Amino acid sequence: MATDTAVTGAPETMQLRLASGNGPVTRTVLRTPLRDALPSEVPLIDISPIFSTSVADRKAVACKIHDAATNIGFFYIQNHRVPSRDTDMAYSASLDFFRQDMEAKMKADAKKGPFDSGYRGPGTQRVNPDEGADLRETYSILYDPMLDPTVPDPARIPEPASRFLHLGRAPFESTDTLPHFKDAFVRYFQACLALARALTRTFALSLDLPESAFDSKVQYPDASLEINFYPPISTGHAVSAPADPDTRVSIGSHTDFLLFTILWQDSNGGLQVLNREGQWIRASPVEGTFVVNIGDYLQRITNDKYVSTVHRAQNWSGRQRVSMPFFWGFGMHESCQVLESCCGEDGKSKYDEVRCVDWVSRRLGNLFDLSDKG
């Protein structure tokens, strides 16, 4: 359980339990008022030069991303080439889906669908056992090569990659009450695919590697798109049993599993990041941007040089909130050891090589272990 500590002349603290790829860990959190992130804490990076023909321009952005990834693990990106029309359509379709009656939404129940993709209702998820149940509904799909414009013939994908892929299994047939939903979702998913691959090359540059270093590892990626629908938190909400405001969460405190996440959020806000001092800070919406955050696997292969930072969401806006995270990682059939460029002068790596499928299994297993101990 989370415990409080009072020190004379210093802010009160609490210990927050978290799941990780190495088992349960704790973070010391200051009980200080929530505040807005400073520009130096969650920087805004113009990534338009990553599309330039100039290597120097691309490296300049990579340097900025390197700084953000080592200091906080969160940053905004602008001029990302994802059309606003695509985000607007996906946002509108998401609202249309979640505002349906429960019977219509349950046609896409993730428990009935393939590979747990589809809809999850309110009160059915709890990311962190020291906090309340997540006050959200979600709809998600996994990477499907049939939705990937870079894959000319999904039926000819070789082993072992094909073993982990799910062709034509996105649960769109269960959303036929909204004919526009599939088109909006697919367009946005494809835009995120293109952006994620471009950012992967920039991350390679940021680590003093050739831009193409990770290209083959994301040819058939482990990727998913999730739409989160957050009702406003209220003290009388049926799911928010704990009395401590810190435990009432739209999504509980956690880190992400994979390489990085690309997050679109609406104007209502609610995303909070735990900074290095142990303070919760707001990563408020900035129009026309995405938030990018480092995941656990990227922290691992960089020997902890890049930081996978704890974050959560609390929707105190009084309005319905939507966020659309796109989770991005190497293909499940791939593996990666600590990068040589991250081992330092002594050449030591903190971690062994691990297959991505084993990493995800371990990460999920540790999450469930932590929940069971709550």
Swiss-Prot record:
The chain positions of domain Fe2OG dioxygenase read 220-330
Q: Name the InterPro entries on file.
A: DIOX_N, IPNS-like_FE2OG_OXY, IPNS-like_sf, Iron_ascorbate_oxido_reductase, Oxoglu/Fe-dep_dioxygenase_dom
Q: Which annotated residues bind 2-oxoglutarate?
A: 321
Q: What reactions does this protein catalyze?
A: peramine + 2-oxoglutarate + O2 = 8-hydroxyperamine + succinate + CO2
* EC code: 1.14.11.-
Q: Which PANTHER family match?
A: 2-OXOGLUTARATE (2OG) AND FE(II)-DEPENDENT OXYGENASE SUPERFAMILY PROTEIN-RELATED (PTHR47990)
What name does UniProt use for this protein?
Answer: 2-oxoglutarate-Fe(II) type oxidoreductase ppzC
Q: Which organism is it from?
A: Metarhizium majus (strain ARSEF 297)
> What gene is it encoded by?
ppzC
